[in-house]
Amino acid sequence: MANIDKDPTKGLNAAVAAELRAERKAQEVTFDDLVERISLSRATTWRLLNAERLITIEALVEIASALGVSVLEIVERAEKRLAKKTPPPRRRGRRHALAMA
């Protein structure tokens, strides 16, 4: 089983990538325009925005700045996205306790 912290397609990394893509699209910034605004290569930017690679804080700052949005806002949105996808923890024994009452 893959470690969620090291797998770029899961967890917060994937949610951050999704939020960066959503922000780019909301602002109608083309991928090529974004690449021109930052120092990252086209291939690296593609991998980061598609959660194929773990995003560094430096890359996150650069991409967010190029889109005119704060890193905090992107991370908060990503956390909300994760919260929607994460089911609440299951409580064990509750059904059994109610049946005995």
What are these regions (language model features)?
Residues 24, 35, 64:
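The alpha-helix within a helix-turn-helix
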Residues 2-4, 75-101:
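Short, charged recognition helix plus adjacent turn
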Residues 21, 32, 61:
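Residues within the helices of the helix-turn-helix
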Residues 39-54:
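Recognition helix of helix-turn-helix/homeodomain-like DNA-binding domains
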Residues 1-28:
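A short, Lys/Arg-rich alpha-helix, primarily the initiator
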Residues 52-65:
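Short, basic-rich loop-to-helix N-cap that marks the start of a DNA-contacting helix
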